[in-house]
Amino acid sequence: MPYLLEMKNITKTFGSVKAIDNVCLRLNAGEIVSLCGENGSGKSTLMKVLCGIYPHGSYEGEIIFAGEEIQASHIRDTERKGIAIIHQELALVKELTVLENIFLGNEITHNGIMDYDLMTLRCQKLLAQVSLSISPDTRVGDLGLGQQQLVEIAKALNKQVRLLILDEPTASLTEQETSILLDIIRDLQQHGIACIYISHKLNEVKAISDTICVIRDGQHIGTRDAAGMSEDDIITMMVGRELTALYPNEPHTTGDEILRIEHLTAWHPVNRHIKRVNDVSFSLKRGEILGIAGLVGAGRTETIQCLFGVWPGQWEGKIYIDGKQVDIRNCQQAIAQGIAMVPEDRKRDGIVPVMAVGKNITLAALNKFTGGISQLDDAAEQKCILESIQQLKVKTSSPDLAIGRLSGGNQQKAILARCLLLNPRILILDEPTRGIDIGAKYEIYKLINQLVQQGIAVIVISSELPEVLGLSDRVLVMHEGKLKANLINHNLTQEQVMEAALRSEHHVEKQSV
């Protein structure tokens, strides 16, 4: 049987740099192939070639789809062939309805007049196909991210898709939304629709794939059956070396209590009747890694936003640092107390995309370079920037490059560099490795371990339970705004954490860390 897709010896250069070099990829109808590689490995470039974003003639090699060579000059050319790509940043218009988004650019008309009755009927069938029980007239901006992702798939199905490319589709989804999405991909597979799945979440890659293709430094490293590969096998192919332990387990000692929070309650910014955090108390020691686990909506981010002074609603409770009660109502007061935070959404809250990498790093510590006068000491600032880039291994062609052009992992390292310039005693990391590749994750994990060895206390909030369990000395489990468990991490399992989240009573382990 001929392949649905064959990409033969694809090479794409930018100036003298080969982004992809002689890469081959092929798949059958109904096959799910995961494309794996670190950020900057060439995955996105290869997909842009396939979709016509990089037009025929701008690359070397040949693309055969459904038995015909594709020579696309625009993404619309490949869409007409049945190839659709859904990016991590969804391409939906939030102010339009579900129906209007699905048919945008593909409206059904009769004599120049749009046939809304026929489009509504078609839209209802498409929504049913992706298991969405919503009205076609629903405004897309009112949907959750998981539902928006499914609307994107319905939009692709409306274009008679034969090959669906999903780029980091679950980066912002809950575990339940992820499960629904994977089930729908499997259902599409039964209808002969092929899928190229791009994700840094290797458990998903293993669960969904028939075949795994690995690219490293722009070159095709290998394609193997998913059933015969372990996560360690994938990592080794991706990074070119064996990571003996993803989570460094260097011994570190904890000191005295540095932080204590008592009876923290936070209300919804608009609806004062809704408690987002409900009577939460906990402590933190010097040199301790405290993980906070829970489902989306558990109140984890709201809790640490109160601690950092950026929760937009009202809250009450007591915060003690070094045994003394402190009042923190903004981030400047938090920083003055030795607290720094890497926010959950780095693109929205963590970086200024058009600003240089170096300026993003020094943004919160400009007082270090003024010497009591208003004029910046440019030489001192540049020296600090270069040292930070080297220390955190930020990969950038220049400190003056706009940070928005860096990979997610390197943006995150730059944000960490900014935090470390503040000389924090308490470092809060909210989803520290979301959407970044395995190599960058490993470097961040090593950095966290180095920081606690220096006595810095670290709070880690993560939706990935293996990450929480792999890093933490102790785990707080939250559910619906309440602290349900405070557990010493003596070989804790994911099942124990989820059981603690869902049980009715509060559970605390009294052992010392």
UniProtKB/Swiss-Prot annotation:
Location of this chain's protein in the cell = Cell inner membrane
Q: How does it sit in the membrane?
A: Peripheral membrane protein
Q: Which GO terms describe its molecular function?
A: ABC-type D-xylose transporter activity; ATP binding; ATP hydrolysis activity; D-xylose transmembrane transporter activity
Record bears the keyword DNA damage: no
One of the record's GO cellular component terms? membrane
Report disulfide bridges, numbered on this chain. none
Q: Which InterPro entries match?
A: AAA+_ATPase (IPR003593), ABC_carbohydrate_import_ATPase (IPR050107), ABC_transporter-like_ATP-bd (IPR003439), ABC_transporter-like_CS (IPR017871), ABC_transptr_XylG (IPR013455), P-loop_NTPase (IPR027417)
Q: Does the keyword Ribonucleoprotein apply?
A: no
Q: Where does ATP bind?
A: G37, E38, N39, G40, S41, G42, K43, S44
List keywords of the entry alphabetically: ATP-binding, Cell inner membrane, Cell membrane, Membrane, Nucleotide-binding, Repeat, Sugar transport, Translocase, Transport
* BP GO annotations: D-ribose transmembrane transport; D-xylose metabolic process; D-xylose transmembrane transport
- ABC transporter domain residues: 5-242, 259-505
Q: What is its EC number?
A: 7.5.2.10
Q: Which reaction does it catalyse?
A: D-xylose(out) + ATP + H2O = D-xylose(in) + ADP + phosphate + H(+)
**What enzyme category does the UniProt record give?**
translocase
**Membership in a protein family:** Belongs to the ABC transporter superfamily. Xylose importer (TC 3.A.1.2.4) family.
**NCBIfam families hit by this protein:** PRK13549.1 (NF010069), xylG (TIGR02633)
Quaternary structure and partners: The complex is composed of two ATP-binding proteins (XylG), two transmembrane proteins (XylH) and a solute-binding protein (XylF).
What PANTHER family does the annotation carry? CARBOHYDRATE TRANSPORT ATP-BINDING PROTEIN MG119-RELATED, XYLOSE IMPORT ATP-BINDING PROTEIN XYLG
Q: What is the protein's known function?
A: Part of the ABC transporter complex XylFGH involved in xylose import. Responsible for energy coupling to the transport system. The XylFGH system can also transport ribose in absence of xylose.
What name is this protein filed under? Xylose import ATP-binding protein XylG
Protein encoded by which gene: xylG
